[in-house]
C-alpha cells in the first residue's frame, strides 16, 4: 500500500443577503454538559453497509441544493425530484426517541445535554450539538482576532463539511473528530442512534432546509474536486454522494485555468456575491471539498427605506462612529437576561427563519456574553421572550470574512485531521492530510424585502409611548431555522461601518 503524503484542501464558501432587521432594548420589561457514557463501536461506520438507494440520474430537480447549478454539458433532466425521494422526510424529522437516561434522573446534572434533548426530535438534537460545536469554535476564533473585528461564520456549512470528511476517517482520527463535533454525544444519547444516524440526518437536513416554497431562498452545494489519477476510494465517493449530495469532479490543480473556472462556478452559485474566492492553490493538492451556502430572506416586519438615518454607534467607551440606522415599528419577541446582562430581540423572516440580536447592556459585557453562550442559554432566551409592540433601530451592515480554520480546529482538539499520521484510509489508500480549511462568507443586512412596495406602510407613534430596542453598540446575531433548530449563521458586529 502506498503512503505518499498528499494535501487535502477544504473550501467553505457562504453568502447571505438579508431583507430588514431590528435591535436592543432601551426600555424593555426586565422581566456541564456530559452525555451518558457509552462505548459506541466507531468502526461500525466502516463495517456496516451505509449504502442507501442510489439516486436516479435526474438529481435534485425540485430541490435548490443543485437545481440551479447544473454542470456544463448536463441537462435539467439529469437531476432528480427530491420531493419524491424524501416523501417521508417530515415524519422522520419529527421523530422523538427515548433517551439512554431520563433527564429527571438524580444523576443527571442541571447542565446535562440530555435535558436539552428531552422532547426534541432527532434532527433537533443533532442541531443542538452542531450549535454547541459552533459556539466553541466561535470562542476560539474570537481569541484569534482583534476585539474590534467583526466575525461571521456558517455553522451548518462547517458541520456539514466535517460530517462529509468523517465518512473517510478511521480509528483515533475518526473518534477525535466525532468527539469534538459532539457526534459521539449524539450516539450515546439513545440506544436507537448509531453513526449512520448522523449521516442520514445530514441528508434529511439538506432536504428540509433547501427545499423550495418556504418564502426564503436558501441554497447549498457541495463539490468534491479530485486531482487527476488520484486513487480516491469508490466507496467514499459513493457515500459522499448519497449522504451529502457531493459530486466528485476531476480537476487539475496545476492548471491555472482551474482557479478562474472555479471562481466563475462559485460566483454563479452565490449569485455574484462572492467573487475571486480562489486566489491561488497549491499544485500538489489532491482533493478539495467545497461547500457553498446562499441565503436571502425577507423580513416579516420590514424597514421603510425612508426611515433610515445616520445614528451614533458606540464602538467602545471612547469611540463613536456614524452608521446608517434602520428603523421600524411592529410586534416583536424580546427578552432580558439579567444573569448575562443583555437584551435579546427576535427578528422573523418569512418562512420560519429568524435572527436573534443579542446586545450587552455594558460595553464590557461582550466578553462575558461570548464566554457564556451555549445552546441552553439560547433556549432560555427563546422561552422567556414576550411579544409586544416595539420600535426597533438596527444598523445596516455587510460582513465579508475569510478564515483558514485549521489552527482553530487544532486548538479545539482536532489535530490528527491535519497531521501526516492521521488515518484517512477510508478516503484513499495513500496517506493524505488537510492543510487548508477555508471558510469564506458574506452577509448583508438592510431594509430590503421581497415586496418592497409594502415597506412604506409602517406607521410610527411618538417615541415616548413605545418600548424601544436600539442597537447602538457591538452585538451578536444568530440565525436559526426553527423547525429543525438549525443554527445557520452567527457572528459579531463590532463595527457596522466596516466589513
UniProtKB/Swiss-Prot annotation:
Disulfide cross-links: none
Keywords: Blood coagulation, Chemotaxis, Disease variant, Glycoprotein, Hemostasis, Heparin-binding, Phosphoprotein, Protease inhibitor, Repeat, Serine protease inhibitor, Signal, Sulfation, Thrombophilia
Region (2 X 11 AA approximate repeats, Asp/Glu-rich (acidic) (hirudin-like)): 73-97
Annotated consequence of substituting residue 122 to W: Greatly reduced thrombin inhibition. Normal glycosaminoglycan affinity
Record keyword Glycoprotein present: yes
Signal peptide per UniProt: 1-19
An annotated GO cellular component: extracellular region
GO biological process, any: chemotaxis
Listed CDD domains: serpinD1_HCF2 (cd02047)
Molecular function via GO: endopeptidase inhibitor activity; heparin binding; serine-type endopeptidase inhibitor activity
Post-translational modification Phosphoserine, affected residues: 37
Tissue-specificity statement: Expressed predominantly in liver. Also present in plasma.
Residue list for modification Sulfotyrosine: 79, 92
Stretches for region Chemotactic activity: 68-79
Alphabetized Gene3D superfamilies for the sequence: Alpha-1-antitrypsin, domain 1, Antithrombin, subunit I, domain 2
Residues in Sequence repeats: 73-83, 87-97
Residues of the site described as Reactive bond: 463-464
Glycosylation sites: 49, 188, 387
UniProt free text on domains: The N-terminal acidic repeat region mediates, in part, the glycosaminoglycan-accelerated thrombin inhibition.
The protein's role, per its UniProt record: Thrombin inhibitor activated by the glycosaminoglycans, heparin or dermatan sulfate. In the presence of the latter, HC-II becomes the predominant thrombin inhibitor in place of antithrombin III (AT-III). Also inhibits chymotrypsin, but in a glycosaminoglycan-independent manner. Peptides at the N-terminal of HC-II have chemotactic activity for both monocytes and neutrophils.
Disease: Thrombophilia due to heparin cofactor 2 deficiency: A hemostatic disorder characterized by a tendency to recurrent thrombosis.
Family as reported in the entry's similarity comment: Belongs to the serpin family.
Protein's recorded name: Heparin cofactor 2
Organism of provenance: Homo sapiens
Gene: SERPIND1
